[in-house]
Amino acid sequence: FDGIIGAGGGFVQMGDEMLYHKKVSDEDVHRVVDFFETNHYDYYLESNGGLFASKNLIKRLESIIYGDLKNDPEARRKKEEEPSHFITALIENENMYRNDVNKICFLEHESIPFDEIRKQFCDAFQVIECTVPAFGDASGELSVAGVNKHTAIEALINHLGIDQKDTYAYGDGMNDAEMLTFVAHGVAVGNAKEGLKAIADEVCDDIANDGIYKNMKEHGLI
């Protein structure tokens, strides 16, 4: 198998073949963008064509990842010598009303609680809280309703004729919950959210300590 499950289960690609691809409808993209722009959210649209950033997103991410660029020489050094691959991948100044959106990720808003996002969009989206802890407790993502990593893995193993009992998955955030409960061996990494560890079959070492690699060696996968 040489492929990828991307966008939180939004698409499955094997080599050059796209097994399936679930995108956000144009109507729902407009709806979310209008809400986020009106309420001054920092967010980005994830698509197979790139990551498209809202107006002030990169400035805020630089503050989170590097620190105080204006007053701290060490922060400026980090930006110059150790640039974030995530930040450099973001595309600015593009039309956000796109027709190729897989999911939408947003940072925490200082005055709007996460429950308000759930209330606004739960009719059309799967609303997942705090998938990237650095983005804040009230951050999250909006993905196509009914689409997750479980559904993607199920479609893939059915296509390949692989038995579910032979499946393993590793996760760190709550958007991995359905995946870890579906596969036969669901493993949470040591730095995972506590809620994910609670439902995992096993907890391995942290990502920074090569937890996935070591666990795969233990299970004879590599």
Language model region names:
Residues 9, 110-112, 190-194:
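Short, polar loop motifs at secondary-structure junctions
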Residues 50-168:
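Conserved acidic, metal-coordinating active-site core of Asp-based
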Residues 139-222:
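Mg2+-dependent phosphoryl-transfer enzymes with acidic/Ser/Thr/Gly-rich catalytic loops
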Residues 1-70:
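Active-site phosphate-binding/coordination module
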Residues 36, 118-121, 196:
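A generic structural signal for well-ordered alpha-helical segments
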